[in-house]
């Protein structure tokens, strides 16, 4: 980093990698003129673990536990992208019941990720109370995850061709109860935060990104939608069963930190709508033991239909990836999570390139903080929403 040659006495400050507001091991070298930011240089790589190279020496089923360590707050999405690639390479069909359960898990994971963004973001700008509120709702989601997958985090639930296990007894009723409860809590967040004049002073007009600028920087997710671009891969690519549900893309025009907050808050409400529709329309209904009903062929043969299964086949460790390449992507809470996959007719991928949304979105940070105040760095960085596990990989 070159020190600007001026007549002013500039100060260079290291923020991180151990600063509590860095959201992981991010280091910023900030050049200050008093309280004004002259330059900012992010230093990455403190959490690099070679995830792409590890993939080249593992079968997909062996690699699944690794991918949950990218974005460890939204692990369902990393699992989804890991199985979606081989499914498309092998033209593997997923039963509709399994696809619906995947959608439910993905949207619950999206809400949990947005909640754990909201609490620390508010703490960064000086509001401690919401930090404790969000853990209350997040615990309910983790209880649902634990009942369905056995793990509160790092679920290892998705499989090539479906999911690892069907939903347990009573899970659907618990999830519907959570949906009704959570909608009232979102209203509470709006009353507590959105109309707070101190909060508005800190975020309104801070870190503005225009629509064209957002596209040029390759931004995605709430960062892009808050800049007036209603782009959501769930609508564009229509993967899983998202095209069967009624929901709207949430977006704002202002492009500032407040707009990014509003997009994420309203996205949680839309996720609840999707979950409720998926639960009510789940193929096979809420009956838990579909496998035992499958044996009753004489009484009701429809339960043997492909769509009612939760998984087609348990994948073999020797599952071969055909000799071709493709790019597959999902709409993760932080943006477009993609994988460029090259198979070579073996059990291991020849190339596994990860496109993490946090890494791309973080690149615009130096442009946003220039000519801003030192305290605004925390607001802008918090509004981007990064997890260093996926930034460094």
Swiss-Prot record:
Any Gene Ontology CC annotation: chloroplast thylakoid membrane
Coiled coil: none
GO molecular function: NAD binding; oxidoreductase activity, acting on NAD(P)H, quinone or similar compound as acceptor; quinone binding
EC number: 7.1.1.-
Chemical reaction(s) catalysed: a plastoquinone + NADH + (n+1) H(+)(in) = a plastoquinol + NAD(+) + n H(+)(out); a plastoquinone + NADPH + (n+1) H(+)(in) = a plastoquinol + NADP(+) + n H(+)(out)
Any one GO BP annotation for this protein: photosynthesis, light reaction
Membrane-topology descriptor: Peripheral membrane protein
Cited Pfam families: Complex1_49kDa
Keyword NADP: yes
Location(s) in or outside the cell: Plastid, Chloroplast thylakoid membrane
Keywords of this entry: Chloroplast, Membrane, NAD, NADP, Plastid, Plastoquinone, Quinone, Thylakoid, Translocase, Transport
The organism's place on the tree of life at top rank: Eukaryota
Family: Belongs to the complex I 49 kDa subunit family.
Subunit structure: NDH is composed of at least 16 different subunits, 5 of which are encoded in the nucleus.
Role: NDH shuttles electrons from NAD(P)H:plastoquinone, via FMN and iron-sulfur (Fe-S) centers, to quinones in the photosynthetic chain and possibly in a chloroplast respiratory chain. The immediate electron acceptor for the enzyme in this species is believed to be plastoquinone. Couples the redox reaction to proton translocation, and thus conserves the redox energy in a proton gradient.
Protein name as annotated: NAD(P)H-quinone oxidoreductase subunit H, chloroplastic
Provenance organism: Crucihimalaya wallichii
Gene label: ndhH
